[in-house]
Amino acid sequence: MSQSEKENQGSGEGKTQDMAIFSPPVVRSGAGALNRALFTKTVNLAAAAVNDNRLISKYRKELEHSKELLRQDRLSPIVNHPDKALADQGKKCLLLSPNVKAPEPETWGAALKEGVQKKELSVIPYELQLNYDYWTYHDIITSILPEELHDDIPSGFNTAGHVAHMNLRERYIPYKKVIAEVILDKTTNIRTVINKVDNVGAESEFRTFQYEVLAGPDDMQVQVTENACSFEFDYSKVYWNSKLEAEHRRLINMFEPGEVVCDVMAGIGPFAVPAGKKGVFVWANDMNPESNKYMQVAINRNKVSQYVRPICEDGRTFIHHAADSVLEAHKNGEHVLIAPKPPSRAKKAPKPEPKRVDIPPTISHFVMNLPATAIEFLGCYRGVYAGHEDLFSAESGRKLPLVHVHCFSFKADDETPLNDICERITKYLGFPVKPGNPDVEGEVAVHDVRDVAPAKRMFCASFRIPREVAFAERV
């Protein structure tokens, strides 16, 4: 070994070169069919052939400590002996780091040398065979795509059950089939890969989209579990975004058992159903009949029919009469009975009576998860409690509802998005607001939800309906 090679072994450059031997072969197959057979490679390594399997653990620890043991993702350092006869006898080897060379004892550490001297092991050449199954999605795609496309390799996608939903940029479209096949191979539980061919909502008021199947069957009937609830739906007919699970959970955590929540654009119930499971009364509306159908499926599946009421109408109409509907339910004495926990067998106390929980007279929260246009619905809150000022008297202790409205705005590090959102709320609500504490009239808390595009983010603005708005004369 030359002096420069020895120096490189101890340098970062040498380590990088060593690890490069595990990279897949470059297969610039372009937009053609994926040929998995081309992804094979022989990596020449050294191995410590341990004569007595009882010593494997000892030498593994020693070689790990000396950093001579192979440490490579998805590869076990313990392998069968390359000699089939010895392998049939159960003999094992420990794979060694690429900088250890079998015919060069000067590259061996003290543990290896001692093991050889004691005749407890021998250092032998080992041909490690790698194939398509070993490499990751990123490894395979990097070897297929031309270098000029390596800066932004498609990796993120939404999932809905067994469906991976991609939104490929134009320059990757020629490779869409290959990309989809590799995703299918490398992603657990994915059976179908689709690509969106238009913007969500571009052709549908229900936020559904046109798609093409890139790999797998055209099967869009999916099952999803989110926030401890099970959903089943046709992904091509309703809106679902797995990236919103944390936002769903954030708002659900704000709801208290026994409160009333009105979900204006409820979809199939990602807010409503888990909230119902928590003991929250939910009026859940969506104007898409398919969403309403699958919400009812989720309500029954998750056993929350006592708490969640599916409604199918325009969101503006829903807001106009939501308060009256809740108040009427309260006046009619609508309630749920919560069965008590059964007493332990050791106790002979009489069985306790079920707990009655009445629907309260007022709404605690409105949720408006339609970020493209929800702010434009805010004018509908004018007069929502007209004539019912007494419900919010000082003696009652009740507060006007909190509104949680999702929206899009600019991506910026300064106050620009907050000011933009407050200006739009002011315009449609007809009442001036500014960033601040949502419990203070005229102030709005803005939560940053997620990135949706390079210069666009999704936010959730929360505020209490001002008294001037809630008690205004109804139009």
Swiss-Prot record:
Record field: catalytic activity: guanosine(37) in tRNA + S-adenosyl-L-methionine = N(1)-methylguanosine(37) in tRNA + S-adenosyl-L-homocysteine + H(+)
SUPFAM superfamilies for this protein: S-adenosyl-L-methionine-dependent methyltransferases (SSF53335)
Top-rank EC class of the record's enzyme: transferase
Chain coiled-coil ranges: none
Subunit: Monomer.
Biological role stated in the UniProt entry: Specifically methylates the N1 position of guanosine-37 in various cytoplasmic and mitochondrial tRNAs. Methylation is not dependent on the nature of the nucleoside 5' of the target nucleoside. This is the first step in the biosynthesis of wybutosine (yW), a modified base adjacent to the anticodon of tRNAs and required for accurate decoding.
Protein name as annotated: tRNA (guanine(37)-N(1))-methyltransferase
Organism whose genome encodes this protein: Neurospora crassa (strain ATCC 24698 / 74-OR23-1A / CBS 708.71 / DSM 1257 / FGSC 987)
UniProt gene name: trm5
